[in-house]
């Protein structure tokens, strides 16, 4: 197997003051703070840049479907189903590994409301509350699960899948280490 030094990038986490110079065939690897891998943004931070990137991609997909949202011959329930299958699937890609903060949860809810308002053709100037928008969505489709709930459910499903498996992923996720401590009070060093 050959490793290309031009294509290979180096990303590190929490390495302040540590020399991270790696060479392949006397060529130094480029150190980066973020890169795209399989459609996901990998960064040396938490998952906020990835979630914001997914939100931007979702908004772009929503705008590309504007002729569908403005078409009066398509029923409202069909538009919601189209949004769920075409738009939110972009957002939910790899959501199982996200770290959700309170700020990011609010942003996810706001983005979902923006999508529904775009479909319903409701402007913020119309002063329609989020509860009224949710009621209209609930009327159109009976079983409605908001986006944040879907993300949380997928995270739990993924955790259950990994915790039932045997192997390195389970060991890393649960932080279990082979061995143990001796009984009694531990010695001071």
Regions found by a protein language model. Name each.
Residues 1-189:
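Short linear motifs embedded in intrinsically disordered, charge-biased segments
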């Amino acid at each position: 197997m050959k490793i290309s030094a031009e294509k290979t990038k180096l990303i590190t986490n929490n390495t302040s003051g540590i020399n991270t110079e790696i060479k392949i065939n006397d060529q130094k690897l480029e150190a980066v703070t973020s890169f795209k891998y399989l459609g996901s943004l990998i960064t040396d931070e938490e998952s906020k840049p990835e979630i914001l990137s997914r939100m931007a991609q979702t908004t772009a997909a929503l705008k590309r479907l504007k002729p569908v949202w403005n078409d009066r011959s398509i029923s409202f329930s069909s538009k919601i189903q189209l949004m769920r299958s075409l738009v939110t699937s972009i957002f939910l890609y790899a959501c199982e590994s996200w770290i959700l903060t309170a700020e990011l949860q609010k942003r996810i809810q706001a983005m979902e409301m923006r999508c529904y308002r775009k479909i319903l053709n409701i402007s913020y100037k119309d002063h329609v509350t989020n509860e009224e928008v949710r009621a209209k969505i609930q009327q159109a489709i009976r079983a409605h699960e908001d986006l944040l709930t879907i993300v949380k459910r997928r995270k739990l499903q993924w955790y259950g899948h990994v915790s039932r498996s045997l192997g390195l992923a389970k060991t890393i996720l649960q932080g279990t280490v082979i061995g143990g401590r001796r009984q009694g009070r531990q010695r001071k060093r």
